[in-house]
Structures are given as structure tokens and as C-alpha cells.
């Protein structure tokens, strides 16, 4: 593994059109799981100028059964979508939460998919699809996330909080960030470049107002990155194309699942290709990605490695994973195959079956709306939210590998 290099990650804000789509899709997941913890949901969202479209497949007791919606269900779906967009802050001529056109094209789940996934008789619940899923952790930040992505997220979270509070009234919802760090000995030692492109109010692309916006962004960056990473050698690119008044879904169409690297590890780890948002936790694209992060984080938190990548693989309709792979990138204190064996010996994980994962992490709950902006990983485990960020396997792993 190289020890001296430059590495870059990007993030996008809650107002980015693809993230608007992700948040709507996950708000729908939460809505259905609040009605039926065993609901099946695959909800895709399209956002564009004054239009939101939902498409996908569902099954939910008391909401959609036998090919028909329960009374009031479609109205509740539309209300949920509009409230989600309102919370983000879109009240623009080209995209306004009160006035955009809305289309609901959700329909029933395929019976052929259901028969392969549902538990029946002596058959355990199978995986909702085939696929490979990866989890990762490293010791670059306190949350055991890649530093470049961690700081990219934090810049945008700070700006969004200031926009919502009124502290930065010139900001609009659509924003992107990018952080380049120099690493020495595998540790971040300097920020070489910071990129922030933010939608703004009228007039903030010239003169004193432009200077005010750029000074504000630099202040945010200084509050997020450690002081020893910043210097007069750090290059800033703030709205490098100039004006950015037209943004969000009015500037670019948004789709669910197009920010999978932002959602995960910022390019620092492999990705199996499956998006998370809009999917209930029987879909291993989501639940297995969460449990692999959980395992990787606990391995690093236990001091068993400085970096850890984990892969799981599944077949549709089959409950047991096809493979488990651990790679500590030469930083492990014990052999990788011994860590694999220790994981397989933890009974609480239920053999890493879809139901075992969901039961151990408590995933059959309406906890997904919060995941859909600023990353699914490196967040604080609070109450039912972000349970895959807990480090409650540390003692079990240490004991198994003593």
C-alpha cells in the first residue's frame, strides 16, 4: 500500500437533485415501514423542473394489497413527498414544494420475486437479489472514515445548517464539495485543494457579495478541517464557473441511486454497484452493505487493523451468503482468515443471513430518511438510527482472536 500520495473525495448536499431523489425515496421507505415492518419497497424517484415522479414496486399491509391502494394512501404518499422537499428548502420558481407536478407510479411487487425471497415452511427468507457488497473502515478520522470524504461531508453539513438557521441567507440548497489531501505514511498531512460550488441568491456572483460568499466558505472550511492541514498553499476553487443561481432539479434532473460513492467511502474502497435509497432492508444491496461497514468498523475499533475492507456475496432467494472476504491491507495484527473465522463464529449475526442482519441491527424500522444525505456511514449511532455505526462487537472480536 502506498504511503505518500494525494487523494480526493467529493460530497453533495441535501439539495443536489440526485440527493433530493434519494431523500424522497427513503421518505417513502420510512412511510411504508412505519405501517408494516415487513413491507417490501423498491422506490425510484425522478426530479426535474417542477416535476417529481415515483416508480417502483411495493407490498405493504393496510396500504397496498391485492393490487389496490387503501383509502387515503396515495394522498399520504404525495404529502410525504412534498414535506420532504419542503424540509430541504426548495421554494423556487423552477422547483417549489407546493406547486410541482407529482406522479405516483408505484405498483405491486412481482409474485415471482416474492416467492424466492419470502420465508415459507422450513425455508428461511432469501436475499432480495444477487450481488456483492463491501464495507470499509480506516483510522483516518474519529468516526473511522476516509478523511477526504469525512471533511467533504462536514463542509456541506455546516453550510446547510447555516442556510436553515438563517445565518447564511445567501445560500440556496444545491451545493457540492471536494477535498484533496496529501498523505504521508498513510496519514493526512495537508489539504492541497478545496472545491465548493454552491447555489446562491441573486448578485452573489460579482463584487462585494461574491467576496462575502467566498469568505464565508473559507471560514466554514477553516472550522471543519484541522488547522494543521490548512496553509497558504491550500488552493480554493469556490464557484469556479461563476454564477450558480439556477440549481437543484431545475438545473439538472435528479435520480435515485446516482451518488453511491458519496453515500459510501468516497472512492477509498470498492463498491458492489447497488444503491441504497428507496430499498427496504430485505434488499441486501442495503442491509449487507450496512453489516459489512459494521464489521469493518468494529475490526478497526478493536485495534485489529488500521484499514479493513469486507466483501459479502449473495444469490437471490438464498439465505446464506456465498462468500465472506476480509482484507486488512497489510495493517492487521492477526491474519485475515482468522478474522473471517471470528466473524463467522459470532452467533448474534445470525449467519449473516438477510433476516439475521435485519434482526441484529434492527433494520425493520423507519430509519432511512436521515441516511439519504451526507453519507450512510461515519454518522452517530443514536437511538434506532445508524445502528451499523455501533462498536459493540469489539469485545467479542478481541476475545475470539486472543
UniProtKB/Swiss-Prot annotation:
Q: Which residues bind ATP?
A: 16, 174-176, 252, 258-259, 275, 279
**Location of this chain's protein in the cell:** Cytoplasm
Q: Which reaction does it catalyse?
A: L-methionine + ATP + H2O = S-adenosyl-L-methionine + phosphate + diphosphate
Cellular component terms (Gene Ontology)? cytoplasm
**According to its UniProt record, in which pathway does this protein act?**
Amino-acid biosynthesis; S-adenosyl-L-methionine biosynthesis; S-adenosyl-L-methionine from L-methionine: step 1/1
Enzyme class, spelled out: transferase
Alphabetical keyword list? ATP-binding, Cytoplasm, Magnesium, Metal-binding, Nucleotide-binding, One-carbon metabolism, Potassium, Transferase
Keyword Glycoprotein attached: no
Q: Where does Mg(2+) bind?
A: 18
GO biological processes: one-carbon metabolic process; S-adenosylmethionine biosynthetic process
The note on the cofactor says: Binds 2 divalent ions per subunit.
- Report the cofactors: Mg(2+); K(+)
How far does the signal peptide extend, from start to end residue? none
GO-annotated molecular function: ATP binding; magnesium ion binding; methionine adenosyltransferase activity
Segment Flexible loop: which positions? 109-119
Annotated residues for binding of L-methionine: 57, 109, 252, 283
State one Pfam family annotation: S-AdoMet_synt_C
Residues that, per the record, bind K(+): 44
EC numbers on record: 2.5.1.6
Family, as annotated: Belongs to the AdoMet synthase family.
Note the subunit structure. Answer: Homotetramer; dimer of dimers.
Task performed by this protein: Catalyzes the formation of S-adenosylmethionine (AdoMet) from methionine and ATP. The overall synthetic reaction is composed of two sequential steps, AdoMet formation and the subsequent tripolyphosphate hydrolysis which occurs prior to release of AdoMet from the enzyme.
Q: What is this protein called?
A: S-adenosylmethionine synthase
Annotated organism of origin: Rhizorhabdus wittichii (strain DSM 6014 / CCUG 31198 / JCM 15750 / NBRC 105917 / EY 4224 / RW1)
What lineage does UniProt assign to this protein's organism?
Bacteria, Pseudomonadati, Pseudomonadota, Alphaproteobacteria, Sphingomonadales
Please state the gene responsible for encoding this protein.
Answer: metK
